């Protein structure tokens, strides 16, 4: 059985970027629901004892009638696991070394990368994610709809940001651009 991990930080640790009410509701309600639904969908299947990455890369092992629901819920679980880890203020440090060099090579500079990341995040119609991924030896920014995960497309995820309104609405209402810009703080 898959279990949602407790956050490694307090709900208020992301303030002022994201307030504790948003973190609490987002993690304990939305994220937990993805885990609950995933567990219900994989019960009594060949994926029951597998991890999320395996599930998402082996969706063809389940009946087609539940495949889309499983992709959405396992994707929501996996994507949010990454999101909370990326946002962990304990791990927060400047991007440097090989990643910094790769970003500069792909986008010109970190500032140009941030602008492009925000721009792509604003293009997501409705709900989805904006990602920095690695394909072969190249970095690129992609977006996915709903809870689709780049690993199902063969990408290695560097990091991503949730642009579903529940991720930012209590703080930013409909101002997704402001949320995306402040997310890098």
Regions found by a protein language model. Name each.
Residues 1-185:
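Feature for soluble, non-membrane regions of globular proteins
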């Amino acid at each position: 059985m898959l279990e949602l991990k407790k956050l490694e930080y307090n709900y208020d640790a992301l303030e002022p970027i994201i307030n504790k009410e948003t973190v609490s509701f987002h993690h304990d309600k939305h994220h937990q629901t993805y885990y609950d639904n995933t567990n219900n969908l994989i019960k009594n299947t060949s994926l029951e004892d597998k991890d999320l990455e395996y599930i998402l890369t082996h969706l063809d092992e389940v009946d087609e009638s539940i495949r889309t629901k499983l992709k959405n819920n396992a994707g929501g679980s996996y994507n949010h696991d990454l999101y909370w880890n990326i946002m962990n203020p304990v791990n927060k440090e400047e991007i440097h070394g090989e990643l910094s060099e790769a970003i500069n090579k792909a986008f010109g500079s970190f500032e140009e990368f941030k602008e492009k990341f925000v721009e792509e995040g604003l293009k997501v119609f409705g709900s989805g994610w904006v990602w920095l991924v690695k394909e072969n030896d190249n970095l690129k920014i992609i977006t996915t709809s709903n809870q689709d995960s780049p690993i199902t497309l063969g990408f290695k995820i560097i990091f991503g940001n949730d642009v579903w309104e529940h991720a930012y609405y209590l703080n930013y209402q409909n101002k997704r651009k402001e949320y995306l810009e402040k997310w890098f703080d």
